[in-house]
Design a protein with these regions (language model features):
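Short glycine/proline-rich turn/loop motifs
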Residues: 40-42, 46-51, 112-120, 262-276, ...
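Active-site/ligand-binding neighborhood in enzyme catalytic cores
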Residues: 155, 162-163, 187-304, 311-314, ...
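Rossmann-like dinucleotide-binding core of oxidoreductases
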Residues: 151, 165-168, 174-194, 342, ...
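Active-site rim elements
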Residues: 118-129, 273-281, 353-361, 418-430, ...
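Mid-domain catalytic core of redox enzymes
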Residues: 301-413, 443
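N-terminal glycine-rich phosphate/pyrophosphate-binding loop and immediately adjacent elements
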Residues: 41-185
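Conserved flavin/dinucleotide-binding core of flavoenzymes
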Residues: 23-44, 314, 320, 364, ...
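Extreme N-terminal leader/targeting segments of oxidoreductases
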Residues: 1-57, 75
Length: 518
């Protein structure tokens, strides 16, 4: 990153000492399997070496779950094949650059971004939580360098048409005033002895001291504004008159609008959203590319699965490639096909598995991106982070890469609410652009004149995906169906995250290992 602004970069080296293949869970409780035992939370290093010798596995789908499974299984001696319906590996791990084509069921778009390695759009996963240890471990092992991803930025905006006259509010002012008002309210209750039953005398003094700092209260425990909110005129960059604080918003105004009571207020405190967040330098597909390079010889592209059959303690897959149907037989199958697609493939699944597959719900999440002069940096001092609105576009993301450069890719919409995302998905690409321009202009008045070259991805319309990530809670699908094991982010505790796909792959490998050593 050539720029004059310091940004931390975590470079994942090639050392195998900290790679996923050598990490163990010392607290895991073993499960007795005769001559073989496995921890409840299985991971590489827990499976017996060469345990797959003479056994074969067919994996349906070359996404992260499929490629993780293949990478680890072949190290155990299994003969592994991956059947991928599309012409690329990675599944929903995709990065769109100049010239790339997005094909949906009823439309096609070509990306018109300038040819520049810094100008890219991650329409699927776009961030990595710092505690997603296995994904980060693979990045280290595969030499995929990571950089900081700014998830929360107090210089970004909060907007509701029904709050503060529809004027976007700089996040730092809202957070400061919420903390200050609530702290003052609680301090007043303590000083009026309203909490005597809950607090000792020492507790009261200590809590009051904490509240004074937490809410930036004065010596009378009143809130009359804070420098944390910035200064009038130029909230994000200071002003010529540093003595003029921004007018305090009273508590009733702050809580009167349902949007200002909602998800954004604790977004960055969510377990998977807490700082530090990370992203691969150059695009999320760097991870998919690294995996692909290690299992490339195992993948058959353009292999559309037509049937999944059980045959005398083995599995037969019938797939079609270039109009020709082929049978592929294996001892075991790991199926990572999204249930939205899987439900329409003829199969021999148990009735319980079929029922859960047919009722499994996916998010209709969608994203849209524009290329633009970095007006958010140059004019508003917003460097990365997310602005929120209760319009359909929901979020605007500012890029965390190439800070200080002239142009960047701004995410003009990230929509996952069911009604809004469905409506967005039903629009034509141009209609989506038009809507995003109008709504984005309500946050940044220069928006329509600055952004261009819009491109969108509605995951419910993407062939062989038909959804963004799983929403339902799996039960039966967590169990093998004879020699068929299901995997994918939708079957993990971390739905919608690459780490979840990896954990699900580990579970699938563990199930196969238990069968082999039964």
């Amino acid at each position: 990153m050539a720029m004059g602004i310091g940004v931390g970069v975590s470079s994942c080296g090639s050392s195998s000492a900290d790679s996923p293949t050598t990490q163990m869970n010392s607290n895991a409780q073993p499960i007795s399997l005769g001559s073989y035992s496995s921890p409840k939370s299985a991971r590489p290093g827990d499976w017996p070496a060469n345990s797959g010798a003479g056994k074969s596995v067919v994996i349906l789908g070359a996404g992260i779950a499929g490629m993780t499974s293949a990478f680890e299984l072949q190290k155990l001696g299994y003969s592994v094949s991956i059947l991928e319906a599309t012409n690329r590996a990675g599944g929903r791990i995709r990065t769109i650059r100049s010239g790339d084509v997005v094909n949906e069921l009823t439309s096609s778009q070509t990306c018109n971004f300038d040819v520049n390695g810094e100008l890219y759009f991650n329409p699927g996963p776009a961030r990595i939580a710092h505690h997603h240890e296995f994904l980060i471990g693979y990045c280290r092992e595969f030499n995929v360098p990571l950089e900081n991803f700014t998830n929360d930025n107090r210089a970004a905006l909060l907007h509701s048409p029904s709050a503060f006259g529809g004027t976007p509010q700089v996040a730092k002012t809202v957070f400061s005033d919420i903390r200050g008002n609530i702290s003052s309210l609680l301090a007043s209750a303590i000083n009026q002895n309203a909490l005597d039953q809950a607090l000792t005398t020492n507790d009261k003094a200590n809590v009051l001291s904490m509240l004074r700092n937490y809410g930036d209260l004065d010596n009378n425990y009143s809130y009359s504004g804070s420098s944390r909110a910035g200064f009038s005129g130029q909230e994000n960059v200071g002003s010529r008159d540093r003595d003029t604080q921004i007018t305090v918003k009273n508590l009733s105004d702050l809580v009167s609008d349902t949007f200002l009571q909602s998800r954004w207020i604790n977004f960055s405190e969510g377990y998977n959203q807490q700082s530090s967040m990370l992203q691969p330098i150059g695009g999320m597909d760097k991870i998919a590319t690294a995996f692909r390079g290690r299992v490339a010889s195992n993948i058959t592209y353009g292999a559309v699965v037509k049937e999944i059959r059980k045959v005398s303690n083995s599995i037969r897959i019938i797939y079609e490639k270039n109009g020709i149907q082929t049978e592929h037989n294996a001892d075991y199958c790991i199926c990572t096909i999204p249930t939205t697609v899987l439900k329409d493939i003829p199969n021999d699944f148990s009735e319980a598995h079929k029922t859960e597959i047919s009722s499994f719900v996916y998010s209709n999440a969608a994203k849209l991106a524009f290329q633009s002069r970095r007006f958010w940096e140059q004019d508003h001092s917003i460097f990365g982070g997310i602005s929120w609105t209760n319009q359909d576009i929901t979020q605007i993301w500012y890029p965390s890469n190439a800070l200080g450069h002239n142009d960047g890719i701004i995410i003009g919409a990230y929509i996952w609410g069911n009604t809004a995302s469905t409506n967005f998905s039903n629009q034509s690409p141009q209609q989506r652009i038009n809507s995003a321009l109008l709504q984005g202009n309500n946050l940044h008045s220069e928006y329509q004149s600055e952004v261009s070259k819009g491109i969108s991805v509605a995951w419910r319309n993407i062939p062989f995906q038909l959804g963004a990530y799983g929403l339902s809670t799996a039960n039966t699908l967590l169990t093998p169906d004879d020699n068929i094991i299901f995997a994918g982010e939708h079957l993990s505790i971390l739905k919608g995250w690459q780490e979840g796909a990896i954990l699900s792959a580990y579970n699938a490998i563990n199930e196969i290992t238990k069968k082999v050593h039964a």
